[in-house]
Every structure is written in structure tokens, then in C-alpha cells.
Amino acid sequence: MERQSQMSEENLNNTAAPAEAAGSEQEMNSLMQQRVAKVKELREAGIDPFGHAFPGAQSVQSVREKAAPAEGGEFGPEVTVAGRLMAKRGMGKSIFADIKDSTGRIQLFVGKSEIGDEAFALFRKLDIGDIIGVHGPTFVTRMGELTIRVKECTLLSKSLRPLPEKYHGLQDVEQRYRQRYLDLIMNDESF
């Protein structure tokens, strides 16, 4: 009797796992379908979502080294940086975002009045994981964070697959080895 109850609990546990996996797989398919729809919208708007060159891009590390901290709202030198969009925080007519390249991470400030309505609408539609190029002057926020005030933004490559959650990240060691590209994107310690 006790053995039967253990077996039935195991069966319940085994059936729950595939259901959860199917749910996350459906969620993944839904996210990918949304991103494919965004690619279609971009193409209809005359924007090529893949395969751009972005000449003159500097590394984040070189921008951090060369940018002298501007004081009292002054702007530093104009820089051109390309990287993967890692975070986006919208606040009405302005957006703060983070991009990351192989040398580090830097914050962006995108203002609607600075880049115009069309470019701002395009930036709002960008997803985490998309690769973008930006141009603009540097400044230091009140919190002491070096930031680029974006004057121009170019979509270099659209990401069709979503990145793993930031909070949980890639915890499974086997998955980190199988999907090394994700490990390199998400974990700075992997380099």
C-alpha cells in the first residue's frame, strides 16, 4: 500500500515536470513569435533588422578611460559605441538603458526631444538582447554613473531569442557549457 502511494506521487511529480516544461516552451514560442512580428514591422518600415556595419565604434572601456567626468551638467566628448542592449527603464519621454560589449557596460540616456519621435518610437520597440549602435556626448548623472546622451541610434541586429532572466541567470552548469554563447553574454566572470 505504501509502495503504491509512493509510486503515485512519483507519477504526479513526473507528469508535473513535462507540463511545466511545455508551459515554458509555449512561453518561449510566444516571445519568439512577438520578436519575429517586430522584425516584419521593421522591414515594412524600411529598416533592415540584420547585417549593418557600424564604423567608428569605440569600446566601452576606451570610452570610460577617455571620458573626463563633466561637472555641473556639462557634457564630455562625443562617442560612438556599439553593444548588446542589456536593460531598459522607461520614464515617459526618456529612457535609461544599458549596453554591453566585450569590454564592459555603459548607461544610455535616450530623450524624445533629443532623437526625435520616430527614433524614440523605434528605441521603445527594441528588445533586451538586440545589438545597437549609439552616438552622443557623455555626462555623469547625479548618482555618479557615466552615461551617453544618445543623439543617434542604429539597430544593428535584432535578437530573435530572449536572454535568460537576470535574477536567476544560467545556474545549470551543464547548460552553461552547452550554450556557451549565453554564458559569455550573461556572466562577466566567464571571460
Language-model-derived ranges and their functions:
Residues 1-191:
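Class II aminoacyl-tRNA synthetase catalytic cores and aaRS-like
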